[in-house]
Swiss-Prot record:
Classification lineage: Eukaryota, Metazoa, Chordata, Craniata, Vertebrata
Residue intervals on the Cytoplasmic side: 1-25, 109-112, 155-177, 228-266, 326-331, 377-388, 442-459
Modified residues (Phosphoserine): S6
Positions of post-translational N-acetylmethionine modification: M1
Residues involved in H(+) binding: D156, E185, H281
Activity regulation description: In contrast to human ortholog, not inhibited by myricetin.
Protein's UniProt name: Proton-coupled folate transporter
Disulphide bonds in the chain: C66-C298
Protein backbone atom coordinates (compact mmCIF):
# COMPACT_ATOMS: atom_id res chain seq x y z
CA UNK A 1 0.00 0.00 0.00
CA UNK A 2 2.79 2.45 0.90
CA UNK A 3 4.44 1.98 -2.46
CA UNK A 4 1.48 3.10 -4.52
CA UNK A 5 2.00 6.35 -6.36
CA UNK A 6 -0.44 9.10 -5.45
CA UNK A 7 -1.41 11.88 -7.85
CA UNK A 8 0.66 14.22 -5.72
CA UNK A 9 3.60 11.85 -6.12
CA UNK A 10 3.20 12.00 -9.89
CA UNK A 11 3.20 15.78 -9.74
CA UNK A 12 6.36 15.55 -7.66
CA UNK A 13 8.14 13.61 -10.44
CA UNK A 14 7.11 16.24 -12.98
CA UNK A 15 8.38 19.05 -10.76
CA UNK A 16 11.68 17.24 -10.26
CA UNK A 17 12.17 16.96 -14.00
CA UNK A 18 11.34 20.63 -14.57
CA UNK A 19 13.73 22.19 -12.03
CA UNK A 20 15.69 25.03 -13.65
CA UNK A 21 18.45 25.29 -11.04
CA UNK A 22 19.12 24.21 -7.46
CA UNK A 23 18.19 27.33 -5.51
CA UNK A 24 18.22 27.62 -1.70
CA UNK A 25 15.12 27.70 0.47
CA UNK A 26 15.74 31.16 1.98
CA UNK A 27 14.13 33.14 -0.90
CA UNK A 28 10.91 31.21 -0.38
CA UNK A 29 10.73 32.16 3.28
CA UNK A 30 11.59 35.77 2.43
CA UNK A 31 8.88 36.10 -0.21
CA UNK A 32 6.25 34.30 1.87
CA UNK A 33 6.76 36.47 4.92
CA UNK A 34 6.94 39.64 2.83
CA UNK A 35 3.48 38.86 1.46
CA UNK A 36 2.07 37.85 4.86
CA UNK A 37 3.36 40.91 6.72
CA UNK A 38 2.18 43.17 3.93
CA UNK A 39 -1.32 41.75 4.40
CA UNK A 40 -1.41 41.26 8.19
CA UNK A 41 -1.62 44.81 9.64
CA UNK A 42 -3.65 45.92 6.61
CA UNK A 43 -6.20 43.19 7.30
CA UNK A 44 -6.50 44.28 10.94
CA UNK A 45 -6.92 47.92 9.93
CA UNK A 46 -9.42 47.00 7.22
CA UNK A 47 -11.51 45.01 9.70
CA UNK A 48 -11.29 47.95 12.13
CA UNK A 49 -12.57 50.42 9.55
CA UNK A 50 -15.32 48.12 8.26
CA UNK A 51 -16.61 47.56 11.81
CA UNK A 52 -16.28 51.29 12.54
CA UNK A 53 -18.43 52.08 9.52
CA UNK A 54 -21.07 49.50 10.47
CA UNK A 55 -21.29 50.82 14.04
CA UNK A 56 -21.37 54.47 13.02
CA UNK A 57 -17.98 55.31 14.47
CA UNK A 58 -16.14 57.76 12.22
CA UNK A 59 -12.87 55.88 12.66
CA UNK A 60 -10.70 58.96 13.09
CA UNK A 61 -8.02 58.88 15.74
CA UNK A 62 -6.58 62.38 15.93
CA UNK A 63 -3.53 62.14 18.13
CA UNK A 64 -3.99 65.62 19.62
CA UNK A 65 -7.33 64.72 21.25
CA UNK A 66 -6.74 60.99 21.56
CA UNK A 67 -7.11 60.91 25.33
CA UNK A 68 -10.65 62.29 25.10
CA UNK A 69 -11.80 59.15 23.25
CA UNK A 70 -10.89 56.71 26.01
CA UNK A 71 -14.42 56.51 27.42
CA UNK A 72 -16.17 56.17 24.06
CA UNK A 73 -18.27 52.97 24.30
CA UNK A 74 -18.49 52.67 20.50
CA UNK A 75 -14.70 52.76 20.25
CA UNK A 76 -14.45 49.98 22.84
CA UNK A 77 -16.95 47.90 20.86
CA UNK A 78 -14.90 48.42 17.68
CA UNK A 79 -11.77 47.26 19.52
CA UNK A 80 -13.53 44.23 20.96
CA UNK A 81 -15.07 43.09 17.66
CA UNK A 82 -11.80 43.58 15.78
CA UNK A 83 -10.01 41.51 18.39
CA UNK A 84 -12.64 38.77 18.14
CA UNK A 85 -12.46 38.57 14.33
CA UNK A 86 -8.68 38.21 14.60
CA UNK A 87 -9.31 35.32 16.97
CA UNK A 88 -11.78 33.69 14.56
CA UNK A 89 -9.23 33.85 11.73
CA UNK A 90 -6.55 32.20 13.83
CA UNK A 91 -8.88 29.51 15.18
CA UNK A 92 -10.06 28.68 11.65
CA UNK A 93 -6.48 28.33 10.47
CA UNK A 94 -5.50 26.21 13.45
CA UNK A 95 -8.37 23.74 13.28
CA UNK A 96 -7.65 22.97 9.63
CA UNK A 97 -3.86 23.22 9.83
CA UNK A 98 -3.48 21.00 12.90
CA UNK A 99 -4.14 17.91 10.80
CA UNK A 100 -2.69 19.00 7.46
CA UNK A 101 0.61 20.60 8.43
CA UNK A 102 1.64 17.56 10.47
CA UNK A 103 0.56 15.17 7.71
CA UNK A 104 2.39 17.07 4.99
CA UNK A 105 5.54 17.60 7.06
CA UNK A 106 6.08 13.91 7.77
CA UNK A 107 5.14 13.11 4.16
CA UNK A 108 7.98 15.38 2.99
CA UNK A 109 10.55 13.06 4.63
CA UNK A 110 9.74 10.56 1.88
CA UNK A 111 8.69 12.53 -1.19
CA UNK A 112 11.01 15.49 -0.64
CA UNK A 113 10.56 19.06 0.54
CA UNK A 114 9.50 20.57 -2.80
CA UNK A 115 5.92 19.19 -2.95
CA UNK A 116 5.11 20.63 0.48
CA UNK A 117 6.69 23.97 -0.42
CA UNK A 118 4.59 24.15 -3.59
CA UNK A 119 1.36 23.23 -1.81
CA UNK A 120 1.96 25.74 1.00
CA UNK A 121 2.76 28.44 -1.57
CA UNK A 122 -0.50 27.73 -3.39
CA UNK A 123 -2.38 27.98 -0.08
CA UNK A 124 -0.92 31.41 0.67
CA UNK A 125 -1.73 32.45 -2.89
CA UNK A 126 -5.35 31.35 -2.48
CA UNK A 127 -5.68 33.29 0.78
CA UNK A 128 -4.44 36.46 -0.94
CA UNK A 129 -7.01 35.99 -3.72
CA UNK A 130 -9.83 35.74 -1.16
CA UNK A 131 -8.58 38.87 0.62
CA UNK A 132 -8.57 40.79 -2.67
CA UNK A 133 -12.18 39.76 -3.32
CA UNK A 134 -13.18 40.94 0.17
CA UNK A 135 -11.52 44.34 -0.27
CA UNK A 136 -12.51 44.96 -3.90
CA UNK A 137 -16.10 43.72 -3.65
CA UNK A 138 -16.74 44.79 -0.03
CA UNK A 139 -17.66 41.23 0.94
CA UNK A 140 -18.42 40.30 4.54
CA UNK A 141 -15.27 40.23 6.69
CA UNK A 142 -16.11 36.63 7.58
CA UNK A 143 -14.59 35.66 4.23
CA UNK A 144 -11.18 36.43 5.75
CA UNK A 145 -11.78 33.39 7.96
CA UNK A 146 -12.59 31.30 4.88
CA UNK A 147 -9.37 32.41 3.19
CA UNK A 148 -7.38 31.53 6.28
CA UNK A 149 -8.93 28.05 6.43
CA UNK A 150 -8.28 27.38 2.73
CA UNK A 151 -4.65 28.39 3.22
CA UNK A 152 -4.31 26.00 6.16
CA UNK A 153 -5.80 23.20 4.05
CA UNK A 154 -2.71 23.31 1.81
CA UNK A 155 -0.13 23.56 4.57
CA UNK A 156 -0.16 27.25 5.47
CA UNK A 157 2.93 29.26 6.42
CA UNK A 158 3.63 26.76 9.21
CA UNK A 159 3.89 23.95 6.67
CA UNK A 160 6.21 26.05 4.54
CA UNK A 161 8.39 26.77 7.58
CA UNK A 162 8.43 23.08 8.53
CA UNK A 163 9.71 22.12 5.09
CA UNK A 164 12.18 25.01 5.10
CA UNK A 165 13.72 24.21 8.48
CA UNK A 166 13.84 20.51 7.59
CA UNK A 167 15.58 21.45 4.35
CA UNK A 168 18.21 23.41 6.28
CA UNK A 169 18.69 20.46 8.65
CA UNK A 170 19.14 18.16 5.63
CA UNK A 171 22.21 20.03 4.42
CA UNK A 172 23.79 21.58 7.54
CA UNK A 173 26.28 20.12 10.00
CA UNK A 174 25.68 20.00 13.76
CA UNK A 175 28.17 22.82 14.24
CA UNK A 176 26.55 25.21 11.74
CA UNK A 177 22.91 24.29 12.29
CA UNK A 178 22.04 26.92 14.91
CA UNK A 179 23.35 29.74 12.73
CA UNK A 180 21.60 28.35 9.63
CA UNK A 181 18.32 28.25 11.56
CA UNK A 182 18.88 31.85 12.65
CA UNK A 183 19.70 32.85 9.07
CA UNK A 184 16.38 31.43 7.92
CA UNK A 185 14.58 33.37 10.65
CA UNK A 186 16.51 36.50 9.63
CA UNK A 187 14.94 36.18 6.18
CA UNK A 188 11.58 36.38 7.93
CA UNK A 189 12.66 39.56 9.70
CA UNK A 190 14.13 41.40 6.73
CA UNK A 191 11.05 40.62 4.64
CA UNK A 192 8.77 41.71 7.47
CA UNK A 193 10.61 44.99 7.94
CA UNK A 194 10.43 45.90 4.25
CA UNK A 195 6.78 44.90 3.97
CA UNK A 196 5.83 46.87 7.09
CA UNK A 197 7.49 50.07 5.90
CA UNK A 198 5.95 49.73 2.45
CA UNK A 199 2.48 48.76 3.65
CA UNK A 200 1.98 51.71 6.00
CA UNK A 201 2.98 54.34 3.43
CA UNK A 202 1.10 52.66 0.61
CA UNK A 203 -2.12 52.44 2.63
CA UNK A 204 -2.02 56.18 3.29
CA UNK A 205 -1.36 56.94 -0.37
CA UNK A 206 -3.63 54.55 -2.27
CA UNK A 207 -5.85 52.62 0.14
CA UNK A 208 -6.14 48.90 0.83
CA UNK A 209 -6.44 47.24 -2.57
CA UNK A 210 -3.01 47.81 -4.14
CA UNK A 211 -0.92 46.32 -1.29
CA UNK A 212 -3.00 43.14 -1.53
CA UNK A 213 -2.34 43.01 -5.27
CA UNK A 214 1.40 43.30 -4.64
CA UNK A 215 1.17 40.45 -2.12
CA UNK A 216 -0.56 38.34 -4.77
CA UNK A 217 2.20 39.06 -7.31
CA UNK A 218 4.89 38.15 -4.77
CA UNK A 219 3.14 34.88 -3.95
CA UNK A 220 2.90 33.97 -7.65
CA UNK A 221 6.67 34.44 -7.97
CA UNK A 222 7.21 32.40 -4.81
CA UNK A 223 5.08 29.52 -6.10
CA UNK A 224 7.00 29.43 -9.37
CA UNK A 225 10.31 29.44 -7.48
CA UNK A 226 9.18 26.56 -5.27
CA UNK A 227 8.06 24.54 -8.28
CA UNK A 228 10.92 25.15 -10.68
CA UNK A 229 13.94 26.63 -8.87
CA UNK A 230 14.22 25.12 -5.38
CA UNK A 231 16.96 22.50 -5.03
CA UNK A 232 15.59 19.33 -3.41
CA UNK A 233 17.50 18.44 -0.22
CA UNK A 234 16.14 14.94 0.46
CA UNK A 235 18.73 12.60 -1.04
CA UNK A 236 16.42 9.91 -2.41
CA UNK A 237 12.79 11.08 -2.69
CA UNK A 238 10.26 8.28 -3.03
CA UNK A 239 6.66 8.29 -4.20
CA UNK A 240 4.49 7.69 -1.15
CA UNK A 241 0.79 7.85 -0.40
CA UNK A 242 -0.29 11.09 1.21
CA UNK A 243 -3.45 9.87 2.94
CA UNK A 244 -2.12 7.32 5.41
CA UNK A 245 -1.82 7.25 9.19
CA UNK A 246 1.83 6.30 8.86
CA UNK A 247 2.84 9.95 8.62
CA UNK A 248 1.09 10.89 11.85
CA UNK A 249 2.45 7.78 13.58
CA UNK A 250 5.99 8.84 12.73
CA UNK A 251 5.42 12.08 14.63
CA UNK A 252 3.99 10.34 17.69
CA UNK A 253 6.91 7.90 17.69
CA UNK A 254 9.36 10.78 18.06
CA UNK A 255 8.05 11.41 21.56
CA UNK A 256 6.94 7.97 22.80
CA UNK A 257 9.26 5.34 21.29
CA UNK A 258 12.49 4.87 23.28
CA UNK A 259 15.77 5.07 21.38
CA UNK A 260 19.34 5.01 22.67
CA UNK A 261 20.40 7.98 20.59
CA UNK A 262 17.73 10.44 21.80
CA UNK A 263 16.19 11.76 25.00
CA UNK A 264 12.41 11.85 25.01
CA UNK A 265 12.52 14.20 28.01
CA UNK A 266 14.63 16.71 26.09
CA UNK A 267 12.35 16.48 23.05
CA UNK A 268 9.22 17.07 25.12
CA UNK A 269 10.60 19.87 27.28
CA UNK A 270 12.29 21.74 24.44
CA UNK A 271 8.97 21.50 22.56
CA UNK A 272 7.24 22.98 25.61
CA UNK A 273 9.81 25.77 25.73
CA UNK A 274 9.30 26.73 22.10
CA UNK A 275 5.52 26.49 22.62
CA UNK A 276 5.63 29.15 25.34
CA UNK A 277 8.02 31.41 23.41
CA UNK A 278 5.85 31.28 20.28
CA UNK A 279 2.66 31.82 22.32
CA UNK A 280 4.01 35.04 23.79
CA UNK A 281 5.48 36.21 20.48
CA UNK A 282 2.32 35.78 18.43
CA UNK A 283 0.01 36.79 21.26
CA UNK A 284 1.77 40.12 21.59
CA UNK A 285 1.90 40.47 17.81
CA UNK A 286 -1.86 39.86 17.56
CA UNK A 287 -2.75 42.78 19.81
CA UNK A 288 0.08 45.22 19.07
CA UNK A 289 -1.62 46.77 16.04
CA UNK A 290 -4.89 47.12 17.96
CA UNK A 291 -3.00 48.49 20.99
CA UNK A 292 -1.36 51.12 18.78
CA UNK A 293 -4.55 52.06 16.94
CA UNK A 294 -6.46 52.84 20.12
CA UNK A 295 -6.08 55.40 22.88
CA UNK A 296 -3.74 56.70 24.29
CA UNK A 297 -1.37 56.08 21.35
CA UNK A 298 -3.82 56.49 18.43
CA UNK A 299 -1.23 55.70 15.78
CA UNK A 300 -2.02 56.24 12.11
CA UNK A 301 -1.13 53.77 9.36
CA UNK A 302 2.31 55.37 8.87
CA UNK A 303 3.31 54.89 12.52
CA UNK A 304 1.84 51.38 12.52
CA UNK A 305 4.08 50.61 9.55
CA UNK A 306 7.12 51.87 11.47
CA UNK A 307 6.08 49.85 14.51
CA UNK A 308 5.60 46.69 12.48
CA UNK A 309 9.02 47.25 10.88
CA UNK A 310 10.59 47.65 14.33
CA UNK A 311 8.79 44.49 15.40
CA UNK A 312 10.56 42.53 12.65
CA UNK A 313 14.02 44.06 13.04
CA UNK A 314 14.94 41.62 15.88
CA UNK A 315 15.03 38.83 13.29
CA UNK A 316 18.08 40.55 11.78
CA UNK A 317 19.64 41.95 14.96
CA UNK A 318 19.21 38.59 16.67
CA UNK A 319 21.09 36.89 13.82
CA UNK A 320 24.02 39.28 14.23
CA UNK A 321 23.87 39.00 18.02
CA UNK A 322 23.78 35.22 17.86
CA UNK A 323 26.81 35.12 15.59
CA UNK A 324 28.82 37.38 17.91
CA UNK A 325 27.71 35.76 21.18
CA UNK A 326 28.53 32.27 19.88
CA UNK A 327 32.22 33.21 19.92
CA UNK A 328 32.20 33.52 23.71
CA UNK A 329 29.05 31.80 25.01
CA UNK A 330 27.31 28.45 24.63
CA UNK A 331 24.01 28.40 22.74
CA UNK A 332 22.09 27.90 25.97
CA UNK A 333 23.38 31.15 27.46
CA UNK A 334 22.60 32.98 24.23
CA UNK A 335 19.00 31.76 24.47
CA UNK A 336 18.75 32.91 28.10
CA UNK A 337 20.00 36.39 27.19
CA UNK A 338 17.42 36.58 24.42
CA UNK A 339 14.63 35.66 26.83
CA UNK A 340 15.80 38.34 29.28
CA UNK A 341 15.54 41.06 26.63
CA UNK A 342 12.16 39.70 25.53
CA UNK A 343 10.85 40.00 29.08
CA UNK A 344 12.12 43.58 29.36
CA UNK A 345 10.43 44.56 26.10
CA UNK A 346 7.09 43.10 27.20
CA UNK A 347 7.21 45.03 30.48
CA UNK A 348 7.88 48.31 28.66
CA UNK A 349 4.96 47.67 26.27
CA UNK A 350 2.67 47.10 29.25
CA UNK A 351 3.25 50.64 30.54
CA UNK A 352 3.74 52.48 27.23
CA UNK A 353 1.41 55.47 26.91
CA UNK A 354 3.52 57.56 24.52
CA UNK A 355 5.12 56.79 21.17
CA UNK A 356 8.78 57.06 22.31
CA UNK A 357 8.15 54.50 25.05
CA UNK A 358 6.61 52.06 22.55
CA UNK A 359 9.69 52.29 20.35
CA UNK A 360 11.87 51.82 23.45
CA UNK A 361 10.05 48.53 23.98
CA UNK A 362 10.70 47.55 20.37
CA UNK A 363 14.37 48.43 20.84
CA UNK A 364 14.69 46.15 23.86
CA UNK A 365 13.58 43.21 21.72
CA UNK A 366 16.76 43.38 19.61
CA UNK A 367 17.98 40.00 20.92
CA UNK A 368 14.58 38.50 21.67
CA UNK A 369 14.60 36.08 18.72
CA UNK A 370 17.87 34.26 19.36
CA UNK A 371 15.95 31.75 21.47
CA UNK A 372 13.92 29.96 18.80
CA UNK A 373 16.80 29.04 16.43
CA UNK A 374 18.74 27.69 19.41
CA UNK A 375 15.81 25.48 20.44
CA UNK A 376 15.14 24.35 16.85
CA UNK A 377 18.78 23.38 16.40
CA UNK A 378 18.79 21.45 19.69
CA UNK A 379 15.62 19.60 18.66
CA UNK A 380 17.05 18.82 15.23
CA UNK A 381 20.13 17.21 16.79
CA UNK A 382 17.93 14.89 18.87
CA UNK A 383 16.49 12.95 15.92
CA UNK A 384 17.85 11.07 12.93
CA UNK A 385 18.38 12.51 9.47
CA UNK A 386 15.30 10.71 8.13
CA UNK A 387 13.05 12.21 10.83
CA UNK A 388 13.67 15.91 10.21
CA UNK A 389 10.40 16.46 8.34
CA UNK A 390 8.41 14.66 11.04
CA UNK A 391 10.18 16.68 13.73
CA UNK A 392 9.60 20.06 12.13
CA UNK A 393 6.00 19.18 11.28
CA UNK A 394 5.60 18.41 14.98
CA UNK A 395 7.17 21.79 15.73
CA UNK A 396 4.76 23.31 13.19
CA UNK A 397 1.91 21.67 15.10
CA UNK A 398 3.31 23.14 18.31
CA UNK A 399 3.49 26.52 16.57
CA UNK A 400 -0.13 26.21 15.41
CA UNK A 401 -1.30 25.29 18.89
CA UNK A 402 0.75 28.14 20.33
CA UNK A 403 -0.78 30.59 17.87
CA UNK A 404 -4.27 29.38 18.81
CA UNK A 405 -3.49 29.73 22.50
CA UNK A 406 -1.98 33.14 21.82
CA UNK A 407 -5.11 34.30 20.01
CA UNK A 408 -7.40 32.81 22.63
CA UNK A 409 -5.51 34.27 25.58
CA UNK A 410 -4.39 37.65 24.29
CA UNK A 411 -7.38 38.54 22.08
CA UNK A 412 -9.79 37.58 24.87
CA UNK A 413 -7.74 39.12 27.66
CA UNK A 414 -7.15 42.42 25.86
CA UNK A 415 -10.81 43.56 25.68
CA UNK A 416 -11.45 42.15 29.17
CA UNK A 417 -8.69 44.32 30.69
CA UNK A 418 -9.41 47.56 28.82
CA UNK A 419 -11.10 49.10 31.87
CA UNK A 420 -8.27 48.64 34.37
CA UNK A 421 -4.99 48.03 32.46
CA UNK A 422 -4.72 47.77 28.69
CA UNK A 423 -1.13 46.54 28.90
CA UNK A 424 -1.86 43.61 31.21
CA UNK A 425 -1.52 40.96 28.43
CA UNK A 426 2.08 42.10 27.91
CA UNK A 427 2.81 41.64 31.62
CA UNK A 428 1.32 38.15 31.39
CA UNK A 429 3.60 37.43 28.43
CA UNK A 430 6.64 38.59 30.39
CA UNK A 431 5.72 36.24 33.23
CA UNK A 432 5.20 33.28 30.90
CA UNK A 433 8.69 33.71 29.43
CA UNK A 434 10.23 32.66 32.73
CA UNK A 435 9.01 29.11 31.97
CA UNK A 436 11.26 28.52 28.92
CA UNK A 437 14.12 30.31 30.69
CA UNK A 438 13.93 27.79 33.52
CA UNK A 439 13.42 24.80 31.20
CA UNK A 440 16.41 25.61 28.99
CA UNK A 441 18.65 26.09 32.01
CA UNK A 442 17.55 22.86 33.66
CA UNK A 443 17.96 20.81 30.47
CA UNK A 444 21.47 22.15 29.98
CA UNK A 445 22.30 21.30 33.59
CA UNK A 446 20.93 17.75 33.23
CA UNK A 447 23.00 17.15 30.11
CA UNK A 448 25.35 20.06 29.37
CA UNK A 449 26.52 18.75 25.98
CA UNK A 450 23.69 16.79 24.35
CA UNK A 451 24.84 15.25 21.09
CA UNK A 452 22.31 12.45 20.83
CA UNK A 453 22.47 12.11 17.08
CA UNK A 454 25.44 12.84 14.87
CA UNK A 455 24.62 13.61 11.24
CA UNK A 456 27.02 13.34 8.35
CA UNK A 457 28.98 16.57 8.30
CA UNK A 458 27.55 18.22 5.22
CA UNK A 459 28.70 21.61 4.17
Amino acid sequence: MEGRVSPVGSSHRLLTAAVLFRGPVEPLVFLANFALVLQGPLTTQYIWHRISTELGYNGTRHRENCGNQSADPVLKEVETLTSHWTLYMNVGGFLVGLFWSTLLGAWSDRVGRRPLLVLASLGLLLQAVVSIFVVQLQLHIGFFVLGRALCALLGDFNGLLAASFASVADVSSNHSRTFRMALLEACIGVAGTLASLLGGHWLRAQGYANPFWLALAVLIVMTLYAAFCFGETVKEPKSTRLFTLRHHRSIVQLYVVPAPEKSRMHLALYSLAIFVVVTVHFGAQDILTLYELSTPLCWDSKLIGYGSAAQHLPYLTSLLGLRLLQFCLADTWVAEIGLAFNILGMVVFAFATITPLMFTGYGLLFLSLVTTPVIRAKLSKLVSESEQGALFSAVACVNSLAMLMASGIFNSLYPATLNFMKGFPFLLGAGLLFIPAILIGVLEKVNPHPEFQQFPQNS
